[in-house]
Regions:
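Positively charged, low-complexity terminal tracts
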Residues: 1-76
Length: 76
């Protein structure tokens, strides 16, 4: 298994189903997540035409663990 991620600018995101938190409300001011193979793409709903950021599932798991533990509460 390779630790190298593909260049997001060279990936096809056209078939990705994007999801956002139900807590984000009805506006377009959201972070959206989409699964693409073994990776998770992240984009800004206000700018869906921009290239998303791409993370491994392990990276997303570490982020979510930090969020759940309150590591980023000072940012809100």
């Amino acid at each position: 298994m390779s630790n190298t991620k593909p260049d997001p600018a060279e990936m096809d995101f056209s078939r990705v189903t994007w999801e956002k938190s139900p807590f984000s409300g009805g506006n377009d001011n959201c972070v959206e997540f989409g699964v693409i193979g073994d990776l998770v793409a992240v984009r800004d709903s206000k700018r869906p035409e921009q290239t998303p950021l791409v993370y491994t599932r392990g990276e997303i798991a570490a982020l979510l663990a930090g969020v759940k533990a309150g590591a980023f509460d000072h940012l809100a």
